[in-house]
Amino acid sequence: MIIHVEENYEAMSKKAALIVASQVVSNPAGVLGLATGSTPAGMYKELVDLFKEGIIDFSQITTFNLDEYYGLPKTNESSYYTYMMENLFNHINVPLERVHIPNGMAEDVEKECLAYEEKIRNAGGIDLQILGIGANGHIGFNEPDHKLSMKTHLVELTEKTIQDNSRFFQKEEDVPTKALSMGIGTILGAKKIILMANGKNKAEAIKEMTNGYLNPMVPASMIQAHPDVILIIDKEAASLL
């Protein structure tokens, strides 16, 4: 694992964007695994700027998002589909038929999860996976548990995650209690992983995920088993290392 400690959120975002841009330039028909939330938003802004400057071209890129809320229509302003459209896809030239986000309104959830895994396999696997990390150590929506799911699955969100995500909704009661998420095995199947974190509220999770122990109660710690991981964090998130 390579660890980059940056001065602040802006520097962290720029660093991550440059690594993603390099990946796109070197493999213009590659597959990106994408994350949502407040952490990668700055990186997406940087990528949009690089696209507008003519430095990168997304026309052959394929994308797979980590997760989506279950029971939330994609047209909902708090859906991850809406997030991705507003923060990235509306501003670059990736063909929407190459964009994949789990269908949170699927009637047959098991079928949707199996189909998502198959789409990833048919695309040749994920070349670069972007991750954030929850304050409780979750990645995607893989919550702390004694037994982690390996493949895309339906997950019950913890009270901590629901509270943390309530800032994206008008009321905490509006936050979905379930989500579809890539599993730990799906994430570890990516050829390269970038995990980003900023802020003091992520410092404990960063300490726990880099201590050398693979602990299912800290799902992010599992990426220590991956041969090509880049951790990009700001000074506050690195404060307990």
Swiss-Prot record:
<dbReference type="InterPro" id="IPR006148">
    <property type="entry name" value="Glc/Gal-6P_isomerase"/>
</dbReference>
<dbReference type="InterPro" id="IPR018321">
    <property type="entry name" value="Glucosamine6P_isomerase_CS"/>
</dbReference>
<dbReference type="GO" id="GO:0006043">
    <property type="term" value="P:glucosamine catabolic process"/>
</dbReference>
<protein>
    <recommendedName>
        <fullName>Glucosamine-6-phosphate deaminase</fullName>
        <ecNumber>3.5.99.6</ecNumber>
    </recommendedName>
</protein>
<keyword id="KW-0119">Carbohydrate metabolism</keyword>
<dbReference type="GO" id="GO:0005737">
    <property type="term" value="C:cytoplasm"/>
</dbReference>
<dbReference type="GO" id="GO:0006046">
    <property type="term" value="P:N-acetylglucosamine catabolic process"/>
</dbReference>
<dbReference type="GO" id="GO:0019262">
    <property type="term" value="P:N-acetylneuraminate catabolic process"/>
</dbReference>
<comment type="pathway">
    <text>Amino-sugar metabolism; N-acetylneuraminate degradation; D-fructose 6-phosphate from N-acetylneuraminate: step 5/5.</text>
</comment>
<feature type="active site" description="For ring-opening step">
    <location>
        <position position="136"/>
    </location>
</feature>
<dbReference type="GO" id="GO:0004342">
    <property type="term" value="F:glucosamine-6-phosphate deaminase activity"/>
</dbReference>
<feature type="active site" description="Proton acceptor; for ring-opening step">
    <location>
        <position position="138"/>
    </location>
</feature>
<dbReference type="Pfam" id="PF01182">
    <property type="entry name" value="Glucosamine_iso"/>
</dbReference>
<dbReference type="InterPro" id="IPR004547">
    <property type="entry name" value="Glucosamine6P_isomerase"/>
</dbReference>
<dbReference type="InterPro" id="IPR037171">
    <property type="entry name" value="NagB/RpiA_transferase-like"/>
</dbReference>
<comment type="similarity">
    <text>Belongs to the glucosamine/galactosamine-6-phosphate isomerase family. NagB subfamily.</text>
</comment>
<keyword id="KW-0378">Hydrolase</keyword>
<dbReference type="GO" id="GO:0005975">
    <property type="term" value="P:carbohydrate metabolic process"/>
</dbReference>
<comment type="function">
    <text>Catalyzes the reversible isomerization-deamination of glucosamine 6-phosphate (GlcN6P) to form fructose 6-phosphate (Fru6P) and ammonium ion.</text>
</comment>
<feature type="active site" description="For ring-opening step">
    <location>
        <position position="143"/>
    </location>
</feature>
<dbReference type="GO" id="GO:0042802">
    <property type="term" value="F:identical protein binding"/>
</dbReference>
<feature type="active site" description="Proton acceptor; for enolization step">
    <location>
        <position position="67"/>
    </location>
</feature>
